[in-house]
């Protein structure tokens, strides 16, 4: 699954992306654009509920990649992101051919977990869904959460401001 402008920073209604990551810092959420495909719809003719999770996952990995975090680097360190909880609030249906923007922002607290807030919007700026996920970084050998995922992401990232770590 790929967005047309993976890694674009834009708000609904913006036609051009002209700012660099450095200019924006973490002032606006990271956004990927995805066109709803016909095979992703269900018998009601709207986007199948499970596909929202795929769109959210695509945006999260695109953000990590834009921040300079490679999946291979995590595998080499024997760590990986894990989702512990996800809540989806459906606001408006999406149909085949609809252009969407999926935003992604990491929110940091203390401890082993973090929150990822995401919004799926239509081309005209209407909110189609809101997603909130609790995640962590798993030690792949010991099968336990790392005590400080924030510090680990900061070490791995070449653009930590994209993850609100600047």
Language model feature labels by segment:
Residues 32, 50-52:
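Early exported N-terminus immediately downstream of N-terminal targeting peptides
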């Amino acid at each position: 699954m790929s967005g047309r402008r993976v890694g674009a920073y834009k708000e609904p209604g913006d036609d051009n992306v002209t700012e660099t990551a450095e200019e924006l810092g973490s002032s606006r959420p990271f956004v990927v654009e995805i066109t709803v495909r016909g095979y992703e719809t269900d018998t009601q003719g709207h986007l199948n509920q499970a596909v929202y999770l795929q769109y959210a996952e695509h945006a999260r990995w695109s953000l990590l990649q834009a921040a300079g975090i490679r999946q291979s680097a995590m595998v080499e360190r024997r760590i990986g992101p894990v989702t512990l909880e996800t809540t989806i609030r459906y606001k408006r249906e999406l149909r085949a051919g609809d252009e969407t923007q999926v935003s992604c922002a990491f929110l940091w607290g203390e401890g082993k977990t973090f929150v990822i807030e995401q919004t799926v919007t239509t081309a005209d700026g209407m909110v189609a869904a809101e997603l909130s996920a609790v995640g962590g970084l798993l030690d792949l050998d010991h099968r336990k959460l790392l005590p400080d995922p924030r510090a680990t992401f900061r070490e791995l990232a070449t653009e930590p401001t994209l993850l609100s770590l600047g």
